[in-house]
């Protein structure tokens, strides 16, 4: 083959690497809506015009959408395309039966056998390992939670079924998170409540928005958003099923109807707060006792047969007889204990399973694993022996997730709540006091409990310690600074400016130091030695000497600084004089260079032909006109400024 033909062939191949959207739609026989869905499910996005090399841009236009040939091949081998075609056929049949033939029985059968496409194989292709899927849960969770708060509207493309499934999946995830004690960080912002959990050693962050009245804007394409959410629903279902299985939990969890009617979200799946809890426990105990009785009866029958054979020996040795009876009783008790502990077997194995999976993925044990386990155990029992009463005005969902994941207990204003407001075991009460309105009917001092604001729980979780409640009381208007815990994470540095964070941290440290000093003074006053006066005098003398030394050092440092500043000023003056001289010299050189350049141009003009001289003159005139217009414009601006 000739070289020119070979070059043309290579050029055609490289130009054929990029295909237009119109070309792909013709090849696949799809609508724009179906093609958009398919691209969202497969994670294929269009290429920018600038990504195409300059050599091959002649054939393409800026306003068109382009995809690569590899993207086209991925889409062409997809199973869902056949499902889309089947759906079209069934829709035609349904319209024909209902509208033209008016055969309603046949139309019902068509609806019952309507084809449905599944996305499980696509999720397995995109995320072959479960940890990869957990990495990409951030967007999925925040989108699903936001979509669950929208009102259903078929005109805009917000489907009622999808809204309900989003609510259900949100509750399933929150139930799993607080039941397995996974929450690590939380933050209150203008957008909503940021929460972070650690699942399979991967950080998952999501937003729970504030309660608001939704406003549907016509500029937003909700049909496109619903396509994304259809994919996110499939992904979250897949991940939740696997996570529940790892922790020996049933999926989907059973929901209590009474708690569901009161709209308690994730708590409706919790057995600890269900109304039928006592009945369930009684039935479980009866079943376990029946199993244990069967086992004990079998063991007793075998023991009786053995004892008949060994009666003669026992008559001779009475000690052996007593020991055999005691062993039989011990075995029966041991069986009953094992039956009672069958409930909690799954809970004890969860941490070991996760630890083994992480080791299998990495192939070795990290030295920081022990630190992570200690932190996890610390957060697990952060609010242990604490009972919080949450008022109706507070964000119940967020506070309940954090408190329950940290080992605390909850009560609220309802007949279903396990702990009522009158109970003396309640340690804290969460609400915000307004100036104009009285929040509580009962006075504060009626019950011995601490009245705090909701920021206290967020700050305790971020600090991983129980903070003093005196700074977060409902009476106080100026609360301590609420710092963002995501400043250390690379993905979430943009949430808070670093300068603000450092300033707030400095302020917070000063407040803590002052509190610590006050606390130490109080302790010293309580535990004073008999010779405390002499010790105080010695301490005061030491402080005075230290202060004198510090003052001397400060004065010496100031004097050195002043001397350096004077030296710098003198150097600057010298530099200015040198610069002025240099500028004068440069200006002289510039004028000389310009003159020499003009002389050279005139010499070249003499050598040029007549045509080129005229062309050069035109260029020169055009440049002069441009300069004149610019000068006029600048003069006008200066006049306006002077006025």
Swiss-Prot record:
<feature type="coiled-coil region">
    <location>
        <begin position="531"/>
        <end position="615"/>
    </location>
</feature>
<dbReference type="InterPro" id="IPR001357">
    <property type="entry name" value="BRCT_dom"/>
</dbReference>
<comment type="function">
    <text>Required for maturation of ribosomal RNAs and formation of the large ribosomal subunit.</text>
</comment>
<keyword id="KW-0539">Nucleus</keyword>
<dbReference type="GO" id="GO:0005654">
    <property type="term" value="C:nucleoplasm"/>
</dbReference>
<keyword id="KW-0690">Ribosome biogenesis</keyword>
<dbReference type="Pfam" id="PF06732">
    <property type="entry name" value="Pescadillo_N"/>
</dbReference>
<protein>
    <recommendedName>
        <fullName>Pescadillo homolog</fullName>
    </recommendedName>
</protein>
<dbReference type="GO" id="GO:0000463">
    <property type="term" value="P:maturation of LSU-rRNA from tricistronic rRNA transcript (SSU-rRNA, 5.8S rRNA, LSU-rRNA)"/>
</dbReference>
<feature type="region of interest" description="Disordered">
    <location>
        <begin position="305"/>
        <end position="329"/>
    </location>
</feature>
<dbReference type="GO" id="GO:0051726">
    <property type="term" value="P:regulation of cell cycle"/>
</dbReference>
<dbReference type="Pfam" id="PF16589">
    <property type="entry name" value="BRCT_2"/>
</dbReference>
<dbReference type="InterPro" id="IPR010613">
    <property type="entry name" value="PES"/>
</dbReference>
<keyword id="KW-0698">rRNA processing</keyword>
<keyword id="KW-0175">Coiled coil</keyword>
<dbReference type="GO" id="GO:0030687">
    <property type="term" value="C:preribosome, large subunit precursor"/>
</dbReference>
<dbReference type="InterPro" id="IPR036420">
    <property type="entry name" value="BRCT_dom_sf"/>
</dbReference>
<dbReference type="GO" id="GO:0003723">
    <property type="term" value="F:RNA binding"/>
</dbReference>
<dbReference type="GO" id="GO:0043021">
    <property type="term" value="F:ribonucleoprotein complex binding"/>
</dbReference>
<comment type="similarity">
    <text>Belongs to the pescadillo family.</text>
</comment>
<feature type="domain" description="BRCT">
    <location>
        <begin position="378"/>
        <end position="474"/>
    </location>
</feature>
<dbReference type="GO" id="GO:0000466">
    <property type="term" value="P:maturation of 5.8S rRNA from tricistronic rRNA transcript (SSU-rRNA, 5.8S rRNA, LSU-rRNA)"/>
</dbReference>
<feature type="compositionally biased region" description="Basic and acidic residues">
    <location>
        <begin position="305"/>
        <end position="323"/>
    </location>
</feature>
<comment type="subunit">
    <text>Interacts with dual specificity protein phosphatase YVH1.</text>
</comment>
<dbReference type="GO" id="GO:0070545">
    <property type="term" value="C:PeBoW complex"/>
</dbReference>
């Amino acid at each position: 083959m000739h070289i020119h033909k070979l070059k043309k062939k290579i050029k055609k191949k490289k130009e054929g690497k990029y295909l237009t959207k119109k070309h792909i739609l013709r090849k696949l026989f799809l609508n724009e809506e179906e093609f958009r869905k398919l691209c969202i499910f497969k994670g294929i996005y269009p290429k920018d015009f600038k990504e195409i090399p300059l050599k091959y841009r002649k054939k393409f236009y800026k306003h068109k959408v382009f995809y690569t040939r590899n993207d086209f091949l991925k889409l062409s081998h997809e199973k869902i395309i056949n499902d889309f075609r089947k759906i079209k056929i069934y829709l035609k049949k349904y319209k024909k039966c209902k509208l033209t033939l008016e055969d309603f029985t046949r139309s019902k059968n068509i609806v019952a056998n309507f084809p449905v496409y599944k996305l499980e194989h696509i999720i397995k292709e995109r995320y072959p390992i479960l940890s990869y899927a957990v990495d990409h849960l951030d967007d999925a969770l925040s989108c699903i939670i936001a979509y669950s708060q929208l009102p259903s509207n078929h005109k805009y493309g917000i489907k009622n079924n999808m809204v309900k499934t989003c609510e259900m999946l949100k509750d399933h995830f929150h139930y799993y998170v607080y039941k397995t004690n996974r929450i690590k960080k939380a933050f209150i912002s203008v957008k909503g409540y940021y929460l972070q959990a650690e699942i399979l050693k991967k950080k998952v962050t999501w937003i729970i928005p504030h309660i608001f009245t939704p406003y549907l804007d016509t500029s937003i394409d909700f049909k496109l958003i619903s396509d994304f959410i259809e994919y996110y629903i499939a992904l979250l279902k897949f991940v939740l099923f696997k996570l529940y299985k790892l922790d020996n939990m049933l999926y989907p969890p059973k929901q209590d109807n009474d708690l569901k009617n009161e709209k308690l979200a994730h708590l409706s799946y919790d057995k600890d707060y269900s109304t039928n809890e006592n009945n369930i426990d009684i039935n479980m105990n009866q079943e376990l006792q029946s199993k244990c009785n069967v086992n004990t009866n079998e063991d007793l029958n075998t023991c009786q047969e053995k004892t008949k054979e060994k009666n003669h020996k026992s008559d001779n040795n009475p000690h052996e007889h007593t020991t055999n009876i005691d062993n039989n009783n011990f075995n029966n008790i041991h069986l009953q204990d094992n039956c009672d502990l069958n409930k909690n077997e799954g809970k004890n194995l969860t941490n070991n399973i996760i630890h083994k999976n992480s080791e299998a993925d990495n192939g070795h044990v990290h030295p920081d694993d022990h630190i992570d386990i200690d932190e996890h155990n610390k957060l697990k029992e952060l609010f242990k022996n604490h009972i919080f009463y949450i008022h109706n005005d507070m964000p119940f969902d967020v506070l309940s997730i954090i408190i329950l994941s940290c080992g605390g207990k909850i009560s609220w204003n309802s007949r279903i709540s396990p702990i009522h407001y009158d109970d003396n075991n309640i340690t804290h009460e969460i609400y915000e006091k307004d100036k104009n309105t009285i929040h509580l009917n009962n006075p504060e001092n009626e019950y011995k409990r601490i009245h705090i604001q909701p920021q206290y729980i967020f700050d305790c979780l971020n600090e991983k310690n129980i903070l003093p409640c005196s700074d977060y009381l409902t009476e106080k208007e100026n609360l301590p600074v609420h710092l963002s815990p995501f400043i250390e994470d690379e993905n979430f540095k943009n949430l808070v400016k670093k300068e603000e964070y450092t300033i707030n941290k400095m302020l917070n440290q000063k407040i803590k130091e002052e509190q610590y000093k006050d606390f130490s003074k109080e302790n010293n006053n309580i535990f004073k030695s008999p010779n405390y006066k002499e010790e105080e005098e010695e301490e005061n003398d030491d402080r005075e000497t230290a202060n004198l030394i510090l003052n001397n050092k400060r004065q010496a440092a100031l004097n050195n600084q002043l001397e350096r500043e004077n030296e710098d000023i003198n150097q600057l003056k010298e530099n200015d004089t040198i610069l002025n001289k240099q500028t004068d010299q440069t200006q002289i050189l510039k004028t000389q260079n310009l003159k020499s350049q003009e002389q050279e141009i005139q010499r070249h003009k003499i050598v040029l032909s007549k045509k080129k001289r005229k062309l050069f003159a035109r260029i020169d005139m055009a440049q002069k006109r441009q300069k004149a217009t610019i000068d006029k414009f600048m003069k006008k601006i200066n006049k306006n400024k002077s006025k």
